[in-house]
């Protein structure tokens, strides 16, 4: 293999990786991994129970759904537009023996049909993305579904619980709820 072949191969790999990262950013948010201690805080705040179904919008490397399936014995489903992260997350799920309770689907957050199954929906997206998703969440989620967002809010949903230190916001799927609580 010549030097030019190596350079062209490296450039091709770089372009593929850059394109997948850009695609994820255009369709929801760039990937910013959530530390496990915040993942644990998210799942506690959402009051996730064994056997419930969690849908993580923008699952990234799958750490939240893996934690939900492993530690909470929940049925955890990820939605991810980045094919490499989706592949990696499903590889980790397989490696950890969690395939019966966890899976990441390669689909856009705007096109997923998984929301009606969710008891809990989690999202760490951008403010503009949350605003675009509000109508879909209100139409497709069960009225009892709990929605937890990190950092960015859903402006037309009333916050039920708020953790200002970690910037976590808990909602129910019904618009116009009035009960509020600050942790």
Where are the language model's segments positioned?
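C-terminal substrate-binding/active-site "lid" region of AdoMet-derived donor-dependent transferases
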Residues: 128-183
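Conserved SAM-binding motif I beta-strand of class I
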Residues: 75-80
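Conserved SAM-binding loop of SAM-dependent methyltransferases across substrates and taxa
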Residues: 63-72
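A short SAM/SAH-binding and catalytic strip from SAM-dependent methyltransferases
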Residues: 118-132
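S-adenosyl-L-methionine
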Residues: 1-49, 87-116
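Conserved class I S-adenosyl-L-methionine
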Residues: 51-60
């Amino acid at each position: 293999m010549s030097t030019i072949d190596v350079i062209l191969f490296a450039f091709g790999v770089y372009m593929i990786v850059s394109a997948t990262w850009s695609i994820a950013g255009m369709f929801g948010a760039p990937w910013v991994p959530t530390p496990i201690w915040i993942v644990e805080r998210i799942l506690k705040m959402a009051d996730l129970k064994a056997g419930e179904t969690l849908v993580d919008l923008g699952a990234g490397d799958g750490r939240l759904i893996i934690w939900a399936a492993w530690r909470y014995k929940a049925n955890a489903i990820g939605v991810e537009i980045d094919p490499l992260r989706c592949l990696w997350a499903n590889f980790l799920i397989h490696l950890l023996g969690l395939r019966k309770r966890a899976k990441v689907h390669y689909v856009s957050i705007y096109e997923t049909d998984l929301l009606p199954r969710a008891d809990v929906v989690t999202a760490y997206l951008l403010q503009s993305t949350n605003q675009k998703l509000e109508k879909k969440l209100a139409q497709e989620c069960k009225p009892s579904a709990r929605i937890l967002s990190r950092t960015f809010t859903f402006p037309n949903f009333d916050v039920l619980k708020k953790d200002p230190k970690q910037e976590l916001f808990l909602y129910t799927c019904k618009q116009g709820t009035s009960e509020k609580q600050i942790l």
